[in-house]
């Protein structure tokens, strides 16, 4: 099921959707390619934001049909790079104020995740993105949450399995990401029922 288009558009012109993915392309996630192609066939304007480089040696041939530009969201490996990325991404006073407001929450995350959230916000604004869509409510969901909090660009998230069922899932962050999302997409009725339980009281729309 495709996430809905956002009706609030902070930029002029047609909606532009930013897909936030941990890795792209990934052979085991051809369903994402299928979804992107379906949306492009409907005339939607998409951009892809990848948080990690692919390590796959083979790719689905359908990837060649994807028109969306792929953007690499830099992941700093050194402290100096992390601080540089934060500084370059927070040049606007409004962004710095929003960043300060969510700092207590960001302190729960690794620094490189925070830096990627800031960088995604910068790129999304640069590309006039009107809506973000994350696949998986884990890394991609967290980075999209940060970018949305800094820019006001709304987001949706498609949840899958490991990102909601695995023992490593942080329930606080799962609830935070889903409650602030414009909409949460579940891939099955079972998952939808499960999310209805774990997200109870958050106001999340599944």
List the model feature ranges, each with a label:
Residues 50-117:
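Conserved N-terminal ligand/cofactor-binding loop architecture of enzyme catalytic domains
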Residues 179-206:
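A short, active-site helix/loop in glycosyltransferases that binds the activated sugar's phosphate group
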